[in-house]
Each structure stands twice: as structure tokens, then as C-alpha cells.
Regions:
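Extracellular jelly-roll beta-sandwich "head" domains, especially the C-terminal globular C1q domain
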Residues: 1-127
Length: 127
């Protein structure tokens, strides 16, 4: 379970493929300068509907991208809930990208589904 009111960097423990060795645990490193499509999905389990918000932040060397959702609209704690974030990021060679999450308020009961079908990160050079 994640502690509340704390920002956590997410470590992804399974790689489907890594063409160039550009991803390690929680950090994607751009191998060359270009535009990258970056995406992440968080598959939440046991969300506390009394939490103020859940956010997912995609942090690159040049910019932060953020999505925030408020679970207080649920009439009960959802067992499953998904958040995703996508960005086309301008990255220089050796710039990095990481995913951070924060649960504000409520109880420390939420966790992430460990299956890579539900919780994942992807980075791809576009141009």
C-alpha cells in the first residue's frame, strides 16, 4: 500500500522489450535527441473514495506532465481504477523520464496492480 500525502517514484519491474537498454527500473533515458511518445498507465487496486485526489506525473528533464483525478465521486471504494498519462516530449540525448504518483488524503490502502497489462510505461522515438 502507498502512504498518503507522499510523492512516490514508480519502479516498473518487468520489461517486455528494451531495444537499446534505455530503460532501467524507473528511468527512461533518451538515446538520441528527438520527439518521444511517452505513456504510462496506473492500474489501481483498493482505492479509498475519501482520498482528495490521485495524481500521476510524467517528469522529463525539460518538463512535467500531470493528470489528476478525484475519487470522491464514487459512492464506495472502487476495487479497480485506472489512470493514464501520455505526452509527446522533446528530449535531448541522455534526458530522462520518470513516473511519480501521489495520493492526497484518505487512507493508505491503495496499491498498484503488478501485472504489466494494467500498470506500465512505454517510450518510443517518433522523430
Amino acid at each position: 500500500n502507498f502512504s498518503v500525502n507522499t510523492t512516490h517514484t514508480i519502479a516498473f519491474d518487468t520489461e517486455m522489450y528494451d531495444q537499446n537498454g534505455d530503460f532501467a527500473s524507473n528511468t527512461f533515458t533518451a538515446p538520441v535527441t528527438g520527439k518521444y511518445h511517452l505513456t504510462a498507465n496506473m492500474g489501481w487496486l483498493n482505492v479509498d473514495a475519501d482520498s482528495t485526489y490521485f495524481y500521476v506525473e510524467l517528469t522529463t528533464s525539460n518538463r512535467n506532465y500531470l493528470t489528476i483525478q478525484d475519487p470522491r465521486g464514487f459512492d464506495q471504494d472502487p476495487t479497480y481504477w485506472h489512470q493514464n498519462i501520455n505526452a509527446i516530449a522533446d528530449m535531448d540525448a541522455n534526458d530522462t523520464a520518470i513516473i511519480r504518483i501521489r495520493i492526497q488524503g484518505g487512507s493508505a490502502q491503495a496499491d498498484l496492480e503488478g501485472n504489466e497489462a494494467y500498470t506500465y510505461f512505454s517510450g518510443c522515438l517518433l522523430a
